[in-house]
Amino acid sequence: MQDLIKRTLPQDDALNQAIVNDLRSQNWAGFLNYSQVQQLCHNFELTTLKLAMHLLPLAASYSHTAISHFNVGAIAIGEQGDFYFGANQEFANSAIQQTIHAEQSAISHAWLRNERRISDMVVNYTPCGHCRQFMNELHGAEKISIHLPHSQNNPLHSYLPDAFGPKDLDIAAHLLAEENHDLVADHQDDLVNQAILAANQSHCPYSNSPHGIAILFKNSDVVTGRYAENAAFNPSLPALQTALNFAYLNDKKLSDIERIVMAEKALKLSHKTMAETLLSTLTSVELEYYSL
């Protein structure tokens, strides 16, 4: 990842050097906090939006695009000004529906860092209909601005007029808002407990079937994922995808996975088979499943 980032940001430029130094200090995690953003903007006389635009090729470098070879980068800006990178993640030898779109990637990245509201989405290509619908699930969706290289300051709803969303199904819950499904993490195995805690933070008001993922890496790091459901159903993002996406954006290698646990309360649907199918194309590590 380090070499790819340096190729993406030529190091004969002072701004790029400063960005690389920030990323190196955090082990190449695709994230810049508010203080880092403000320091870069101050030192190089940039607006927040101009910095985000400059970072789009860097965000896109976190992509895995074995199918399309078309890298999309996105940056979700949180309400306090943090930058969350996102990139499209494709999975060869599996169903195309397993794909993570760049905007989904950035939003789920923000969610797993406990962001509560996205104010802006900066992306290098016009959002597809799938992503427009996914963003419409967000807390504060009516206030989100979309910024493209050729067109800035566009309200999300200008891309999705007469939108269908949670309110049409009489649902008050929104993605990124605090969630609690009263799941108790009291297992003797800590990794199982982390999967349960992730499931407890799922956004699943349509099926009421939360599930979470916990991945243990060989260096003892743990990455978790939560289920993000959508009013339109198909743009929903399973917990395995949010976990894998977070791993990719934090420069984790899937070859270093030691264990993978899923905890699920399968009331109306289950993601167990879908997760096992995807994992079989990525690793020899088998899914450990716990029904709640």
From Swiss-Prot:
GO CC annotation, single: cytosol
Reactions this protein catalyses: cytidine + H2O + H(+) = uridine + NH4(+); 2'-deoxycytidine + H2O + H(+) = 2'-deoxyuridine + NH4(+)
Biological process terms in GO annotation: cytidine deamination
Keyword Zinc: yes
Binding residue positions for substrate: 88-90
Record flagged with keyword Hydrolase: yes
Class in the EC hierarchy, top level: hydrolase
Annotated active site: 103 (proton donor)
GO MF terms held by the record: cytidine deaminase activity; identical protein binding; zinc ion binding
EC code: 3.5.4.5
Pfam families: dCMP_cyt_deam_1, dCMP_cyt_deam_2
Cofactor list: Zn(2+)
Segments forming domain CMP/dCMP-type deaminase: 47-167, 186-292
Keywords: Hydrolase, Metal-binding, Zinc
Function per UniProt: This enzyme scavenges exogenous and endogenous cytidine and 2'-deoxycytidine for UMP synthesis.
Subunit text: Homodimer.
Family the entry assigns: Belongs to the cytidine and deoxycytidylate deaminase family.
Record-given protein name: Cytidine deaminase
Species assigned in the record: Haemophilus influenzae (strain ATCC 51907 / DSM 11121 / KW20 / Rd)
Phylogenetic placement of the source organism: Bacteria, Pseudomonadati, Pseudomonadota, Gammaproteobacteria, Pasteurellales
Gene: cdd
